[in-house]
């Protein structure tokens, strides 16, 4: 296990990478959300993670799990609508699994706790056309890759990203069952879910950061999200 300083550095690097990616993808996420939502998902996600990244200096002396917890707190305060408590509250809840350090085992526990809290708060299941459609296959794949297939974390995370990509693709042909999109009923069919898409973007940046800090290598011809990008 890497020392605390290295783990903190990796968490902060991941935060900055995620914030930059969501800023880059703001318009695309807005376009997706304009079709089936309030057209604010891109702005909300950019604002929340950018505010968290701006607090980097405040996090410099914290343990990694405390950094993650404080990111969650910042998201609750700065991400509008229901997304703030959904993302931020779930991150805060799951951060306790990282107390004592970030390892393959604790990262699995974090992912499972995060997924469970997202499902509990949002009431969504697979097939609801939400971020859960990306999270469930990603978390299950990551857990299996670590615990059953005995893969190194970097390879396991790469497989989880691929699983999330398939989950995002799955949201397009199904009807929304939760959130504002559900009010559209069958008119929501044919549109990719923005929450699942931003989840994939976040996971891609976690993988990119992990490649800088973990031993090993993964083959990626392109970002997984390139395969799900749609012109709305």
For the regions a protein language model found, what residue spans apply to each?
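N-terminal loops that bind phosphate or other acidic moieties
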Residues: 1-232
């Amino acid at each position: 296990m890497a020392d605390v300083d290295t783990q903190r550095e990796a968490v902060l690097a991941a935060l900055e990478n995620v914030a930059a990616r969501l800023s880059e993808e703001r318009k695309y996420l807005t376009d997706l959300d304009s079709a089936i939502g309030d057209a604010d998902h891109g702005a909300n996600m950019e604002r929340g993670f950018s505010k968290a990244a701006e607090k980097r200096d405040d996090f410099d002396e914290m343990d990694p799990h405390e950094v993650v917890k404080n990111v969650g707190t910042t998201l609750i305060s700065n991400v509008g609508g229901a997304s703030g408590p959904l993302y931020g509250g779930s991150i805060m809840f799951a951060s306790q699994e990282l107390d004592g350090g970030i390892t393959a085992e604790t990262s699995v526990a974090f992912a499972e706790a995060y997924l469970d809290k997202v499902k509990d708060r949002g009431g969504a299941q697979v097939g609801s056309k939400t971020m859960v459609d990306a999270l469930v296959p990603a978390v299950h794949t990551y857990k299996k890759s670590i615990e059953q297939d005995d893969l190194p974390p970097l390879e396991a995370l790469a497989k989880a990203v691929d699983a999330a990509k398939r989950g995002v693709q799955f949201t397009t042909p199904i009807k929304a069952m939760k959130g504002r999109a559900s009010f559209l009923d069958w008119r929501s069919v044919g549109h990719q879910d923005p929450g699942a898409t931003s989840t994939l973007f976040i996971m891609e940046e976690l993988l990119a950061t992990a490649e800088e800090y973990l031993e090993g290598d993964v083959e990626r011809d392109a970002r997984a999200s390139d395969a799900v990008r749609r012109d709305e």
